[in-house]
Amino acid sequence: MKKLEIDDFIACVFLVITITVVIVNVFMRYFFNAPLTSAEEIATICFIWSIFVGGASCYRKHMHMGIDILTHLFPKSMKKYLELFINIVVSIIIGVIFYLSVTFSIGARFKPTPVLGISSLYENASLIVGFGLIFIYSVNNLIKSIKTIAGKKGDMNV
């Protein structure tokens, strides 16, 4: 049986909660004419969490679409250096986005959500967790690229 990673598990849990809340709300609205007032906000928050944590999982597994037209222009001997350059750029960009997500979340922590009235930090923390995981994974890819160039074992498809 394949091992379930923590990011996969978290994304799946939030997606299941989203689907369950929406189905229960539809059932309550059409059969009892009594919709759950907070269902839409709960579903939205859970969906946001599933997107950002699921996005990190996809990044870890190299499942995002990419444009490899540029890599085919380089000789095979240069591809590992191009991959190192790409990993450096991605790590820097994701590091900046992670910093901005922390700054944004801290700034919005006192803003209550419209229906539940809870801190927006519960919603915005998904940015911190998602981009934090992507940053960790991108630094890991960067280290693997450096090991590959140095001639050590650094399988890029792990």
Q: Where would I find each of the regions flagged by the language model?
A:
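Alpha-helical transmembrane segments and membrane-interface helix-loop junctions
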Residues: 1-158
